[in-house]
Amino acid sequence: MTRMTKSSSSLFDHIYPYIVITVTITIVFHNSLDCDFTFDDTSAIVQNRHVHTNETDWFRIFDVDYWGTPIRSEHSHKSYRPFTSLTFRWNHLWSPALNPYEFHLTNVLLHIIVSFICFEFLRIMLGPQNRWPACLFTLYFAIHPIKSEAVTSIVGRAELLSTLFILISLFCYFKNAYINFAITVLLASYSKEQGMTTPAICIAIECLKLMIQFKSLNYLPFWSRLWHSLSNLTMAKIIALIAYTALLIGTRIYLAGSSLPIFTKFDNPASFEETPSRQLTYNYLLPLNVRLMLWPRWLCADWTMNSIPLVKTFDDSRNAWTAIFYLVFIILSSRAFYLATSKQSKRLFNIEIDIERSNLLISLILIVIPFIPASNLLFPVGFVLAERILYTPSIGFTTLLAIGWLRIQNYFQRSRFIQFLLNFSTILMLVTFTFRTYERNFDWHNDLTLFKSGLMVNPNNAKLYNNIGHYYERRGEWSEAIKYFRLAADKDQEDIGAELNVARSLIRLNRLKDAEDLLWAIKPRVRTSILKNRMVPQYLNIWINLAHLISMNQTRLHEAENLYQEVLTIRSDFVDAYINLGELYIRKRLFDQAQETYEKALQRARHIDDGKRADIHYNLAIAKSLKLDHQQQKPSGSKLGSLLTEIAQDLMIAIDINREHREAIINLAILLQRPQFPSNNQNEYRTFAINALRSYSRSNELESFQFNIAITLLDIGGPTNRMDAIHHFKRAAELKPDFRSALYNLALLYYDFKDYEQSLFYLNRTLEHYSNYTKALLLTADIYSRMERLDDTEKVS
């Protein structure tokens, strides 16, 4: 009995930290399950057709960035996270209606798993005897308020997954499971770019081993010590890690088209400053990140634009915080190096490192290396501060605090008051964090609550006003949208985007004159901005918006054409200009010019978005079709067949690119019904059309699609296809009970099968809605005659 009790107690001691972690995270983050898709979730999931399982093939995710833009496009932010996007696709597979609940639940579960692994890591770093402190500081990691963005924002899954795989890969590496290490590093890198820092963490620890080995050979001459240190397995590991890192980075650069993303001064103002302002501001951001970890009172989803004033001179008082940060960092680093490289005896995994003396240095490595890519110190990034990017470095920060906590506890182990104070203050901190994180999750309930909470922290951030304006814009509340767009323009006079938003909303309110005057007023400023800064592709939309507005007046089409031509002189590969110019030519019945414009778009525009490429091929098919219909001398025979085939191929390309392109699908089905369509490979085209119609109908069931499937099946012919056609005609009639063509075709088919009762049933349904429909009346009379129901025949006649 005693043995069983001890065994049960031991088991409970082993699992209780996991129970505590799970219950705590569930309590703190359960309100995140009720949140909507917010902020970047919209572009990464809701509007990203590559996440929607019914629209594209899964492998297309590897061709696009996190937001669904082709990775090589200049419009791409170059955030390449295909594995994270695949998990969104899996969520969509489970919840085709795009219910955010499943997405949020997945994030919370992933956070629990990461916290479990963090607990195991802390147990190693603090020593297996310190389970309580390890559990305590795992809770610090798990419920810290900055985790709200990574967990409650669905796109924060990139941080969750990359951190998960980084930790697993470190365990694999130190267990000598190098193949598993390589695989998990790849998964970490394809979850988020910071995963590529994992080999660098291992390199830093291997370098620590080299230093220890070098010092242990102090009885040898310097060059002999150096040779012995470098000519061993440790050095081979470092070389292999460097090679693997180079391969990862090289592949990543190749996939991105060997170009960096284009950011504006509104994304990261310091990037556009001269020396020393740029460097002073970048370095000032370092203590601000530490402040977020130590005092997470002021949290905001967006710190861009004027949220943090630039540090322009050396006499700015904020430089004192930078100096304090570097002073503390140097002291900690010096102490860490001293402890790690002296009196080594124990082993970390299979590495001859005293974990008790090296844990301080390892914690600093885990803070610094994963943070470097987001620090602006190597290259500019598209944000100033971002709470989510601290998710991985916070493991190192948590370890650092836990080490300090243990040192204080051990130093004052005889003082009950200090011990009580230490435990009480720690628990108080965790309780405070619990309430703050729970409160912060409510900010992420929807876009409006999120951005309004941001204005409480950063009232000078014009982007937040713009985002609130977009929220009201999506709801059709145009006046309220204009109010916030104008507030954004007032906060930053250089923010041309806000004024473009105002103009767009004015158009929606039918205040066309006001919108046109505003667009003409800001057009010269856009040209100046293009000359001063790197070109912002979105600003070119002023020409599109202005031309579109002018083209509403049929007498001003020439002005609109000139605007499209003007913007193409600025950017000869501007796809939107080609698309709109082609549509303008179609309106002017200049079908040759329209065709030429669309062909030029396909030739000149690089890395076109899939949706736009599909639209161009569709528009090209329409231009060719209209050109054919309006020719005075219509071609005949093989020439006509060749032109119809060419049109069909353009439509098929559009459908191949975008399986949800409704217009292309329906026009292809109609085109194939033309009697002039060549018989060569006709069934192949019709089979393609049927598959496209069925694929679309699975998610967007429309009576017109069911009808066209049936007609195309009849064109292919054969008893099986005719029976299948009946099914689709019936479905069309169910979706639209007064669908005359579907009802009449059903009657015809049953007439052909000599099933006169069924034929009469559908004829009667047709005549209920269309009592004077001649064809139905004649067919009814014919059936009555065949059935020798002469009285009924006379009534119909």
Language-model features, listed with the residues they occupy:
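Polytopic membrane enzymes that build or remodel cell-surface glycoconjugates and lipids
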Residues: 2-527, 531-541, 545-547, 580
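C-terminal luminal/periplasmic domains and tails of membrane-associated envelope-modifying transferases
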Residues: 2-7, 11, 448-797
